[in-house]
UniProtKB/Swiss-Prot annotation:
Binds 1 zinc ion. Its cofactor is Zn(2+). This is Endoribonuclease YbeY. Keywords: Cytoplasm, Endonuclease, Hydrolase, Metal-binding, Nuclease, Ribosome biogenesis, rRNA processing, Zinc.
Amino acid sequence: MAVLVNNLQEEISVEENLLKLVESVVKVSLESEGYSPDAEVGLIFVDDNYIRSLNAEYRGIDKATDVLSFALNEGEEMPEEEEAEDLLGDIVISLPTAQRQAAEYGHSFNREVAYLTAHGSLHLLGYDHMTEEDRQVMRQKEEGILERLGINR
């Protein structure tokens, strides 16, 4: 699996250990759902202004958020593994928001970025949290991904 990382922000330094961590999170997320080792995901680190403009343009919500996902097959049923496109889509994470949330929730910045990466990966795979039941399923999968990597609160 390829994780193509693009850092478009300058506020927070992106260290090699963070790059390895997010790559591992994406790989475990996709493997746990039976996706091909040939699958690719784009991961883009941005600042609050950038993610705010994306959120306004694509969701009609004019405020910053922590993570957005853009699946290439948005609104379509996920194809069978052998029919799947190699590139699944992009995950966009605001690192300044992740840093604030880590402090607010009392855990590390890396743990927060790992969680947001798992959350975004699951959105690319068709999961959502529009209902309480869907939210619980998604949260269970997110925590399972982090546990497999030994990432705890």
